[in-house]
Amino acid sequence: MNIRKAKTQDVIFIYKLLEYFSSKEVLLPRSLAELYDNVRDFFIAEEEGKIIACCSLHSCWEDLGEIRSLAVEEKLHGKGIAKKLVDLCLKDAPQLGLNRIFALTYVPNFFKGLGFKEIPKEELPHKVWKECITCPKFPDCGEIALIKSI
């Protein structure tokens, strides 16, 4: 398995992976335009030239970043791929001037295992809510907010 920064040629494969999980309502859908605009935020994992997982670190505010669009092919769950991707995002964060990283997730125990602490969503800056407001599940999505200082 190889993990690297995403390139524009990877976007269609990232899109398909995210589309699968958004159809199951466990991730927010991302448009192709949004993915192309934010391709530099993404790390991907590939095996034999095929993208099997992705994760992005998105800069949100001053020193605050968000882990988002974390997806691993279902048949590969439990193999530590998601942890490796999040660890790379956390390692990359200080280079961007980010020292607090949050996630909004339906799988809080995964992030707690990586040292994230649960917080009330209201503690996050209002800028974070720009995507939430357009979500069909807003305001009762059930996602849990977690944060980690690095």
Go through the PLM ranges and name each one:
Residues 2-14:
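A short beta-loop-alpha structural element at the N-terminal edge
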Residues 18-51:
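Active-site rim helix/loop that mediates acceptor-substrate recognition in acyltransferases
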Residues 44, 50-58, 63-71:
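Conserved beta-strand in the GNAT
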Residues 50, 73-84, 96, 113:
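Conserved glycine-rich acetyl-CoA-binding loop
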Residues 78-91, 103:
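Conserved acetyl-CoA-binding loop-helix of GNAT-fold acetyltransferases
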Residues 93-106:
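Conserved GNAT acetyl-CoA-binding A-motif
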Residues 105-131:
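Conserved active-site alpha-helix within GNAT-family acetyltransferase domains
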Residues 124-150:
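C-terminal "cap" of GNAT-fold acetyltransferases
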